[in-house]
């Protein structure tokens, strides 16, 4: 990506105060064309919030997450059900593309910029849709969670 500019949080430090740190980081998200997340290691609280806000700002989120990393495991078993390619649910739902490598992420961004990506970019409503699916699939659990 010859015209890409990488923006990161190292230009501002916590000693300026929490509001300015958050303001800086969210400014970079709001003004980005695409948000690329390093999901190779455990994602921190700030990164998780930035991903959420990227959806609020309708930004494409590409998460670089090779197999067998903290948030992506092969052949995981939950309650006796084998999941061949488990991806952390919050990262899976909020990402527009899970890239197995940085090279794959760059290729996706090039395709996106060229108009070759036809899947709509997820917005903040992706979370409301997840809640609706939960309520529809597990009405008895919703009843148990709801006050009488």
Task: Give the location of each predicted region.
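Conserved catalytic or regulatory cores that recognize and/or transform ribose-phosphate-containing ligands
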Residues: 1-148
């Amino acid at each position: 990506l010859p015209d890409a500019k990488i923006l990161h949080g190292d230009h501002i430090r916590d000693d300026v105060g929490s509001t300015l740190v958050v303001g800086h980081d969210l400014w970079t998200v709001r003004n980005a064309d695409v948000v690329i997340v390093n999901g190779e290691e455990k994602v921190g609280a700030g990164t998780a919030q930035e991903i959420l806000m990227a959806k609020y700002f309708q930004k494409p989120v590409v998460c670089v997450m090779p197999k067998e990393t903290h948030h992506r495991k092969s052949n995981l078993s939950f309650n006796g059900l084998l999941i061949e390619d488990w991806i952390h649910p919050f990262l899976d739902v909020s990402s527009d593309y899970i890239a197995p490598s940085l090279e794959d992420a760059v290729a996706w961004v090039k395709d996106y910029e060229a108009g070759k990506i036809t899947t709509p970019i997820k917005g903040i409503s992706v979370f409301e849709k997840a809640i609706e699916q939960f309520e529809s699939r597990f009405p008895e659990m919703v009843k148990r969670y709801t006050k009488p």
